[in-house]
Amino acid sequence: MKCYLVVVVAALCTLVAQGSVGAPIPKPNPIEDIYASQLPDPGTTAQMAAGDSAYPLTLLASFDPNDTSALH
């Protein structure tokens, strides 16, 4: 009985392996199928004003990589 179980499990494993290898691979759409209307409109993207760069520069200037005060 144990021999039959081994044969059945081996046959099922073979069928599962063949099924997974033989599965069709979906074909992606070529780049020609992307139209200009699907791309984001550059007018709707957020743009930083020139004066807004002062705050990130202040954060960068106050950043100390050797600061270990948060570790204590």
UniProtKB/Swiss-Prot annotation:
Main subcellular localisation: secreted
Localization per record: Secreted; Secreted, Cell wall
Glycosylation sites noted in the Swiss-Prot or TrEMBL record: 66
Keyword set, alphabetical order: Cell wall, Glycoprotein, Secreted, Signal, Virulence
Signal peptide positions on this chain: 1-22
Subunit structure: Interacts at the cell wall with secreted rep1 repellent peptides.
Family: Belongs to the lep1 family.
Function according to Swiss-Prot or TrEMBL: Core effector contributing to spore formation and tumor formation at the host plant. Modulates surface hydrophobicity promoting cell-cell or cell-surface contacts. Lep1 and rep1 interact in aerial hyphae to form a strong hydrophobic layer. Plays a crucial role in hyphal aggregation that might be a prerequisite for strong proliferation of diploid cells and for induction of the morphological changes associated with spore formation.
Name of this chain's protein: Late effector protein 1
Organism: Sporisorium reilianum (strain SRZ2)
Gene designation: lep1
